[in-house]
């Protein structure tokens, strides 16, 4: 009996812990895709992306296993005030073998505090690594406004006619700065911290079913004392964004206009780049030197056309004009219609076209890609996941230019620059060809 009495406090503590854990359950969210594919000419599945384009049409055109695993929990709540801890670890492998070791990417680790400031009800204060208010086109996996990274901010401040958000994040560049080494030689082995300061005004209702979001991002190289940047570094830049979202046909349409300068032009999404150098296979390559400007006009959305048809679509024009003439003009257009045979089975087709003109050569690369997939998904929406699909993809391309990465930047003056397909008797770009692939894939988010 004495033994039983001694164990009683432990049993009570365990029971209390279990009840507490149930009351504060861990949230498990994430994304994953994986599959197997073959190429018509033999070998594993190839994926098709136009040289110079920043994305590709993804249906039946993804050749890796990728996953994001998110664990989060509301760790404290008192009335309408709360603290939430959120994490995200991402993995990517080539899906070529059973055992594929990889280093995970720790993409999110942040705390968000809601309603902590009495005179700003409804606002959230946060700090840590975070996916911050990302804007993307799903069907081409293209993030056009994304300042994610380590940072801090205050968001969703109610200003009456909209919600104001303020944030600062960071993205560092390898090889961006240097201090004196021996014999007054600069050795560019130090990282440069690039800061981004973001201001957004969202949820402004300007027409029935329509909202407007405006944003300004300023990025700069934050250089340490007694350090210097590589020659031609852009140092800083701006990104201006205007996005109109319209509810239409049980879905949405987004119309976006963006203008960027200098360091904000390379990625064109709000992260500063250009204070450092680019690397190719871990060796010094060339100065990014991205002084200039970028204009992007984008329209995309997803709609429902009756009980049996859904469709995604995108149309975009992007002009990156650099002082060094190494920019591009890229325009793309595509649709992804879906016919629903039953609430859980559908046929999906994706047709996409890319055209990229080199500022330096004036030549154009183009590609069209068509995918037909039979799909089983958890629901009758084009957004329903998980989904298992079997697919066949055909791509046809004709490329007249490519980037010269031959030799070393110290002896090749054209290293990293656009050149014609037959420059100096070489072969740049992918030429004029076509290919088809087929396979199966699963995709899930939860």
UniProtKB/Swiss-Prot annotation:
Keywords: Cell outer membrane, Ion transport, Membrane, Porin, Signal, Sugar transport, Transmembrane, Transmembrane beta strand, Transport
Topology versus the membrane: Multi-pass membrane protein
Record-annotated site: Important in sugar transport: 143
GO MF term set: maltodextrin transmembrane transporter activity; maltose transporting porin activity
Ion transport keyword on record: yes
Protein's GO biological process: monoatomic ion transport
HAMAP family: LamB
Protein's name according to its UniProt entry: Maltoporin
């Amino acid at each position: 009996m004495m033994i039983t009495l001694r164990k009683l406090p432990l049993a009570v503590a365990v029971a209390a812990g279990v009840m507490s854990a149930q009351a504060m359950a861990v949230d498990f969210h994430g994304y994953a895709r994986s599959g197997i594919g073959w190429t018509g000419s033999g070998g594993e599945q190839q994926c098709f992306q136009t040289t110079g384009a920043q994305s590709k049409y993804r249906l039946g055109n993804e050749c890796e296993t990728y996953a994001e695993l998110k664990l989060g929990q509301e760790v404290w709540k008192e009335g309408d005030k709360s603290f939430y801890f959120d994490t995200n670890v991402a993995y990517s492998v080539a899906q070529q073998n059973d055992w594929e070791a990889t280093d995970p990417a720790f993409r999110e680790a942040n705390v968000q505090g809601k309603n902590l400031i009495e005179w700003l009800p409804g606002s959230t204060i946060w700090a840590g690594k975070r996916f911050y208010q990302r804007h993307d086109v799903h069907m081409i996996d293209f993030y056009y406004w994304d300042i994610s990274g380590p940072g801090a901010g205050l968001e969703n401040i109610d200003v009456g006619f909209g919600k104001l958000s303020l944030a600062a994040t960071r993205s560092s560049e390898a090889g961006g700065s240097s201090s004196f080494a021996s014999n007054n030689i600069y050795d560019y082995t130090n990282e440069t911290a690039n800061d981004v300061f973001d201001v957004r005004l969202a949820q402004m209702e300007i027409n029935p079913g329509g909202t407007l979001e405006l944003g300004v991002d300023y990025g700069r190289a934050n250089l340490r004392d007694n350090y210097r940047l590589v020659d031609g570094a852009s140092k800083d830049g701006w990104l201006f964004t205007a996005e109109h979202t319209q509810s239409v046909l049980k879905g949405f349409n987004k119309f976006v206009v963006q203008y960027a300068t200098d360091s904000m032009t390379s990625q064109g999404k709000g992260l500063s780049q250009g204070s450092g150098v680019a690397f190719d296979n871990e060796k010094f390559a060339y100065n990014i030197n991205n002084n200039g400007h970028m204009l992007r006009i984008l329209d995309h959305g997803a709609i429902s056309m009756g009980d049996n048809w859904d469709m995604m679509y995108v149309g975009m024009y992007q002009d990156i004009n650099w002082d060094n003439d190494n920019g591009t003009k890229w325009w793309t257009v595509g649709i992804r219609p879906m016919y629903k045979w039953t609430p859980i089975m559908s046929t999906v087709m994706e047709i996409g076209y890319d055209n990229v003109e080199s500022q330096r050569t004036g030549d154009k690369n183009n590609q069209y890609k068509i995918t037909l997939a039979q799909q089983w998904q958890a629901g009758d929406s084009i957004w329903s996941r998980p989904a298992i699909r079997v697919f066949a993809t055909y791509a046809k391309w004709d490329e007249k230019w490519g980037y010269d990465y031959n030799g070393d930047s110290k002896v090749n003056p054209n290293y990293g620059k656009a050149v014609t397909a037959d420059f100096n008797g070489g072969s740049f770009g992918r030429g004029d060809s076509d290919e088809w692939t087929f396979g199966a894939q699963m995709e899930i988010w939860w």
